[in-house]
Amino acid sequence: MATRHQARMAVVSLLYAFDLGNGNIAEHTDEILEEKKIRNKQKDFALTLYEGVMANITPVDEAIVKHLKDWDFERLGAIERATLRLATYEILFGELDSAVVINEAVEITKAFGTEQSPKFINGVLDAISKDK
């Protein structure tokens, strides 16, 4: 059975695909989650997160842009942008403590991002959590 961490990693993958221009990714979420062995309650969790990010993409992106220091949103790597979107959504609209959300995002970034990404992600999300 998949963990919530694995479900979040799958959501980052979905957001990454969306960001790279795969506009019809929503049509393939079930098969992508199945391929990653995200099933049952974790599938419901992943879909809730993905759909929540997509439904709130404008306020999520605005919160990220507001807290980028000397960075242009469009210059962010697609993995970093996807991770920030998921974590920002959870900070703004979720029920988990911000510290838990930030830690999850940092761990996901360690798996997918560059060497500098975890520190960057941590800083942006910390600023967002303090401002919410």
Curated annotation (Swiss-Prot):
GO terms for biological process: DNA-templated transcription termination; transcription antitermination. InterPro entries: NusB-like_sf (IPR035926), NusB_fam (IPR011605), NusB_RsmB_TIM44 (IPR006027). Keywords: RNA-binding, Transcription, Transcription antitermination, Transcription regulation. The keyword Transcription applies. It comes from the Bacteria. The keyword DNA-binding does not apply. One of its GO terms (cellular component) is cytosol. Coiled coil: none annotated. Involved in transcription antitermination. Required for transcription of ribosomal RNA (rRNA) genes. Binds specifically to the boxA antiterminator sequence of the ribosomal RNA (rrn) operons. Belongs to the NusB family. This is Transcription antitermination protein NusB. It comes from Sulfurimonas denitrificans (strain ATCC 33889 / DSM 1251). The gene is nusB.
